[in-house]
Amino acid sequence: MTMTAAVVREFGKPLVIEEVPVPQPGPGQVLIKYEATGVCHTDLHAAKGDWPVRPNPPFIPGHEGVGYVAKLGAEVTRLKEGDRVGVPWLHTACGCCTPCRTGWETLCGSQQNTGYSVDGTFAQYGLADPDFVGRLPARLEFGPAAPVLCAGVTVYKGLKETEVRPGEWVLVSGIGGLGHMAVQYAKAMGMHVAAADIFPDKLALAEKLGADLVVDARAPDAVEEVQRRTGGLHGALVTAVSPKAMEQAYSMLRSKGTMALVGLPPGQICLPVFDTVLKRITVRGSIVGTRQDLEEALEFAGEGKVAAHFSWDKIENINAIFERMEEGKIDGRIVLDLNG
């Protein structure tokens, strides 16, 4: 039995749409029949091989897969055939190291990642660890669920990492595929939201989604305006892939403010040591989320409090999608229909 998949055979070259064998689950594995999968910027980096740790071609990218459990391997008891699940970036972790034992499996040094170190979700079928898939709420359809598997859980965890409490101010910098979901999660979590971007249509979207304050990041008085309107932000989540955006967000914080970074631009950021020390500013990175974070992020979406803006496409168009992604021409998220 074969399936259609998008395969990276050589870094920097177009993905190849081909028929490959359907994998069979071994002990402790499940076979997932994918109905849909989101497309993430990480998939583009995987295909280009431009991150310090690279995958090994040939491989199948993708890590926002949603579908049904099609087959159980031996010793699997947590799931049953027909269960609706999502397969995220974190394919598996060791469960034994200090990060794993303290609730930080996303920092496990032995973790495996879907669509990177193991074949991913740009295919009609795939293998998963039953302990690391997310159960989809009954009210959440496959299309809206797919972006939650990476974009959603990433910004949800990032917002938690800002330590902003209900009624306090948080900045969402960059209202793209991640940022538009971050605005919704932040509002659902009871935060006051300031949204910053350089494009008027993105700011209009943020306002439509409930942002309390929208800021043109190019305005020379952007920092002063935020400080005046909010008294300084309690926290900031930077999704923008820009060191300048990170530095600007830092300048908008009040004393004891926390900035969480989820964007991965090249280069470095320059932050003032004096202000960091005297104002007790915290700057931290945040990467995806744990299994518990994923469950919570999916529940928000299942309750209708968060809804990704996405458009459907076909796996055969993946190379054109990557081109549009590189050019910054994608609004919201892309979800591939894997039934076509």
From Swiss-Prot:
EC number per UniProt: 1.1.1.1
Residue ranges the record marks as coiled coil: none
Any GO molecular function: alcohol dehydrogenase (NAD+) activity
Keywords: Metal-binding, NAD, Oxidoreductase, Plasmid, Zinc
Positions with a binding annotation for Zn(2+): C40, H63
Family: Belongs to the zinc-containing alcohol dehydrogenase family.
Name assigned to this protein: Alcohol dehydrogenase
Species this chain originates from: Rhizobium meliloti (strain 1021)
